[in-house]
Amino acid sequence: MGRKRRVKSESSPFDSFPEDCISYIISFTNPRDACVAATVSKTFESTVKSDIIWEKFLPADYESLIPPSRVFSSKKELYFSLCNDPVLFDDDKKSVWLEKASGKRCLMLSAMNLSIIWGDNPQYWQWIPIPESRFEKVAKLRDVCWFEIRGRTNTRVLSPRTRYSAYIVFKGVDKCYGFQNVAIEAAVGVVGQEPSRRLICFSEAIRRGRRNVVKPKQREDGWMEIELGEFFNDGGIMDNDEIEMSALETKQLNRKCGLIIQGIEIRPAKIL
């Protein structure tokens, strides 16, 4: 038997409620639940289009995220634009967008915004433009033994009271080598406090028995990513904490080549 198709009800007990009352109730949910509510009845479908609801789902400073050249017909259209089209800022070295299901802020630091040891020496790292990156340039590893990448960001640009995960976003070229069976030390935490630590590997080839090593995963945009760790952002716009994320290999010191780094992405952690 096939799956039953959800049929939108022509009438609902809520049809007798004032529309502003329904809007008020739905505004205390989240974007995903609001879209589900729109399938309940025609009354809900109409109400969920209200600007009152979608403005509640937008961050308080959403106007600063709107490109000057863009005009939106509704707050709902604006919301989904901020979900689907990351906004570049800070000299186009960072991008911010909203997680579609929750409306929480997501952030990506470009490779140009990271601290990469020997990154300013073309003998070791090369800065190149590639069409599949959202940023002007990415970092291409030419040849190093000492591998160290660090990134920092103020928590004010993130959503408060939210657990986040940080990911390093990368690709490997055909001649990429030096990362097979090499564990990279990753750390994420508030600057000045003890960070959470783990081992990661840029290659899926890792020795058996090392189950604690986090492997890369394929992204929908064609890049690969590895989770560096998690942190909880408690504060809001008045909070002045900084989060530092790092990935380094400074012990084995074998030659490494061919990795392309787009940046570090921070987004709400998955709830298991």
From Swiss-Prot:
Q: Which organism is it from?
A: Arabidopsis thaliana
Assembly with partners or alone: Part of a SCF (ASK-cullin-F-box) protein ligase complex. Interacts with SKP1B/ASK2, ASK11 and ASK12.
**Part of which pathway?**
Protein modification; protein ubiquitination
Q: What Gene3D superfamilies does UniProt report for this protein, alphabetically?
A: 1.20.1280.50
Q: Which PROSITE patterns match?
A: FBOX
Q: Which UniProt keywords apply?
A: Ubl conjugation pathway
Which residues are in the F-box domain? Answer: 11-57
Record's InterPro entries?
Answer: F-box-like_dom_sf (IPR036047), F-box_dom (IPR001810), PP2-like (IPR025886)
Bilayer-spanning residue ranges: none
Free-text note regarding domains = The F-box is necessary for the interaction with ASK proteins.
Q: Which Pfam families match?
A: F-box, PP2
Molecular function terms from GO: carbohydrate binding
Protein name from the UniProt record: F-box protein PP2-B10
Task: Explain the purpose of this protein.
Answer: Component of SCF(ASK-cullin-F-box) E3 ubiquitin ligase complexes, which may mediate the ubiquitination and subsequent proteasomal degradation of target proteins.
- Which SMART domains does UniProt cross-reference here? FBOX (SM00256)
Listed GO biological process terms: protein ubiquitination
